[in-house]
Amino acid sequence: MQTFFWHDYETSGADSRRDRPLQFAGIRTTLELDVVGAPVMFYAKPPRDAPPHPDACLITGITPQLAEREGLIEAEFAARVHEQLAVPGTCTVGYNSLRFDDEFTRHLLYRNFYDPYAREWEHGNSRWDLIDLARMCHALRPEGIVWPSREDGTPSFRLEHLAAANHLQQEHAHDALSDVHALIGLARLIRVRQPRLWDWYYALRRKQKVFELLDVVNMTPMVHVSSRYPASRGCLTVIAPLAQHPERSGEIIVYDLASDPAEWLALDDDAIADRIFTPRADLPEGVTRIPLRTVRVNHVPALAPLSALQGVDTPRLQLDLEACRRHRETLRGATDLVAKVCRVFQQASALPPAEDPELALYGGGFLSGAERKSLSLVRATPPEQLGECAAAFRDPRYAELLFRYRARNWPETLDAEETARWQAFCTARLTRHTALTKLTLDDYFARITELRSEPAAQDKLALLDQLQVWGEQLT
């Protein structure tokens, strides 16, 4: 049976590698969006080796004391999350989930000895994300839905704003289960108002379909909707696919045809790279970014042929199709363009070595088949015997991950030497800025003090008091 599993996390911060999920909620539906079974919602105990970000706690209202009281140890939390997401035939869906929730899931599973990726594709499973469908709907087929605006007049795609504007069920924004109810309400609205667009975007969760659309041989122009384009343009542009990424087979290098390529085509590789990868704020005054980027075929990119623009108010999107056509012809006439672009992206593709195993999900390679079996062995081993499992892995990441897995979940099973090692690790992480630590306890307390003086936080002083107490317990 094919089903959707609509889900959401509330977390201790925005960094999926360093921060932690504190709440998970989900609802399973049929593909027709009829609810199947009861909703799920549970908390995770907060880690003792890292404080939560005070701002995140103010947004969610989840204090570490609540998570500690109601939550599961992370090993059990990960098992329950995986149990839901790995059901055969499941398409997991969220709102900005490909960039946020799924990254938290991958790192959660990685830390807790699951294959971080298998649940995404095995047994007919897939991933989807409603946020770019909402953007696509606003840009191409806005009829039948109320689109809220920000103060500057640009569209807002925040779930709570869309829910309020369209009278969708959402009792408490930034409560995971309430957000899931709002998400399903938005999905039903889009599916009813724009069924053809719904079906089109649903098909794009299969990467082969995306590959078929991105024709690099002819640089066939495609409509692309993404948060990487300004909201003032409806988050929409027309792109030209140029080449497959030389190192990452699942990425296609594309160019934003709204910009004239003539002024950079004669630059050398280094100059082009500087204008692609240098942070915008660090570019010299008057120098603009070159809008070369990649599209990830497994991230459900919001693509459509130019025919989708028929009947669309293109001036509303600040889209000049004639200029896009000219810019494509300029690209097609450029000598050695593809080779040059591939060299630039190849030089920039190497990931720096991770300085800590918890940061090495993407930089450490894939496990062998035997080591994947060892993941199941670790999860099945009684906590008091886990220390014996370290020899099952050749991958150097996993010996340290195993020690932290034991220490965070079952500290009572550590011997005296291991306990001292764990306490030293926690002290270092709480007191010093390292690759793994971006928020020390001093930073945490300083931010609480700052928030106490901010007008917007005056009704949250009791929550800030609880955060202060929690930090003092960690010292």
Task: Write out the residue ranges for each language-model feature.
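Metal-dependent phosphoesterase signature
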Residues: I59-F77, Q84
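Short acidic, Gly/Ser-rich segments with clustered Asp/Glu that frequently serve as metal-coordination loops
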Residues: E10-R17
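Extreme N-terminal starter segment of soluble prokaryotic enzymes
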Residues: M1-F5
